[in-house]
From Swiss-Prot:
<keyword id="KW-0934">Plastid</keyword>
<keyword id="KW-1278">Translocase</keyword>
<keyword id="KW-0793">Thylakoid</keyword>
<keyword id="KW-0813">Transport</keyword>
<keyword id="KW-0472">Membrane</keyword>
<dbReference type="InterPro" id="IPR020396">
    <property type="entry name" value="NADH_UbQ_OxRdtase_CS"/>
</dbReference>
<dbReference type="Pfam" id="PF00329">
    <property type="entry name" value="Complex1_30kDa"/>
</dbReference>
<dbReference type="GO" id="GO:0019684">
    <property type="term" value="P:photosynthesis, light reaction"/>
</dbReference>
<keyword id="KW-0874">Quinone</keyword>
<dbReference type="InterPro" id="IPR037232">
    <property type="entry name" value="NADH_quin_OxRdtase_su_C/D-like"/>
</dbReference>
<comment type="function">
    <text>NDH shuttles electrons from NAD(P)H:plastoquinone, via FMN and iron-sulfur (Fe-S) centers, to quinones in the photosynthetic chain and possibly in a chloroplast respiratory chain. The immediate electron acceptor for the enzyme in this species is believed to be plastoquinone. Couples the redox reaction to proton translocation, and thus conserves the redox energy in a proton gradient.</text>
</comment>
<comment type="similarity">
    <text>Belongs to the complex I 30 kDa subunit family.</text>
</comment>
<keyword id="KW-0521">NADP</keyword>
<dbReference type="InterPro" id="IPR010218">
    <property type="entry name" value="NADH_DH_suC"/>
</dbReference>
<keyword id="KW-0150">Chloroplast</keyword>
<keyword id="KW-0618">Plastoquinone</keyword>
<dbReference type="GO" id="GO:0008137">
    <property type="term" value="F:NADH dehydrogenase (ubiquinone) activity"/>
</dbReference>
């Protein structure tokens, strides 16, 4: 079944794939990485002015990595805001997705965390660097194929 936003995107010739609805009835769409930035700008102009959360996950060992965006359309006088979930998949070898920092400023730390834990590079992000792990850390700890080092010495911060 096609949702309201998916029908609107089809009407305007914007490429996407509908993934149905989640358990709360929120429409979920898949966008290709090369189309994501332009569609993000269009969604912002359409009224999705709030990035509620951004996260990432490893689909399967050796498989794709996913960056997930939960967007909300908040309007004055509307009791129930409209929500949508966007999934952007990237290959494991060179995971690159356009950053939406310049569309929603709240993507800043969230994209940095996804980079730090999964190694997804967000193109045009102004401060894309590790946020949780030390700069000297090797690898991406939340990937399913990550091998935990036997020993890691953290340098004294003082």
């Amino acid at each position: 079944m096609q949702g309201r936003l998916s029908a609107w995107l089809v009407k305007h010739g914007l490429v996407h794939r509908s993934l149905g609805f989640d358990y709360q009835g929120i429409e979920t769409l898949q966008i290709k990485p090369e189309d994501w930035h332009s569609i993000a700008v269009i969604l912002y102009v359409y009224g999705y002015n709030y990035l509620r959360s951004q996260c990432a996950y490893d689909v399967a060992p050796g498989g794709l990595l996913a960056s997930v965006y939960h967007l909300t359309r908040i309007e004055y006088g509307v009791d129930q805001p409209e929500e949508v979930c966007i999934k952007v998949f990237a290959p494991r070898r060179n995971p690159r997705i356009p950053s939406v920092f310049w569309v929603w400023k709240s993507a800043d730390f969230q994209e940095r965390e996804s980079y730090d834990m999964f190694g997804i590079s967000y193109d045009n992000h102004p401060r894309l660097k590790r946020i949780l792990m030390p700069e000297s850390w090797i690898g991406w700890p939340l990937r399913k194929d990550y091998i935990v080092p036997n020993f890691y010495e953290i340098q004294d911060a003082y």
